[in-house]
Each structure stands twice: as structure tokens, then as C-alpha cells.
Amino acid sequence: MMKRIAALLLTLAVALCAALPVFAAGTIEVTEDVSVSDDYDWTRFQGQNLTLNVYNWGEYISNGSDDSVDVVAAFEKLTGIKVNYTTFDSNESMYAKLKSGAANYDVVIPSDYMVAKMIAEGMLAPLDYSNIPNSQNID
């Protein structure tokens, strides 16, 4: 399960970022504030009763407070995928929880030094770029 984290991390990051307004020729309006490019099949998982468990730093993804866009809600509406979004306050607490096996997350978003440590300990899997349709735009 831990080996899926890296692949799903980038997939979710790309998808969540894509849920922000884009300025492309063809777009799909998700909400009044969110539109996405129509060159991807965002609905391909609808009806499959999927849940994505995300473990991230607090305040990394806007939640609709202070007139911001609720990115998770927009992603759920667009894709039909339920997101369980949990936050942590330090790399060390995140690492300890994952290492102990007390948690089962699909996507974890640690800082750079912790990513290196987790890779060295075999906790992360290589990314499968064929599952990331926008990967050619990543520098």
C-alpha cells in the first residue's frame, strides 16, 4: 500500500491543481469558481465508489474558508471520487504514523528531505507517468 503513495501523490496534485481555473480553448465548468480543461476524461471513475485517502500539511489545499475555492469538493464533484482529507503538523509525526502502520493513505505529501528518507526506506514507489496525463508539462 505504501508503494502506491508516490504515484498517487503526483496524480492527485496534478488533478487538484487542474481543478483551479484554467485558460484553455475548451473548458468544463465545475462550479462558479472552478473550470478545467475538457481534454481529459474527468468522469471516467464516476459510479465506481472510489475513495482517495489524502494525508497533507494543513492549509495546503484550500477548503472554501475565507472565500477560497473548496478544491476537494470541486474534485469530488468533477470526478465522482470521494476524498478523505487528513492533515499533519510535522514531517516527523506523519512519518511515525505511516511507519507504525497505524494509517493507510493513498496520497501523502511530505517535504523534500522526508521524501528522500521515505524513498531510501522503500516506503514510496516510482511514479508511473503513463497514469499522469499532464506529466509532459512538469518541469
Residue ranges, per PLM feature:
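Early extracytoplasmic/lumenal segment of secretory-pathway proteins
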Residues: 26-117
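A generic structural micro-environment signature
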Residues: 7-8, 63-67, 94, 130-133, ...
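Gram-positive cell-envelope targeting signals
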Residues: 1-26
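A structural signal for short loop-to-beta-strand junctions that line the ligand-binding cleft
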Residues: 39-43, 103-107, 125-139
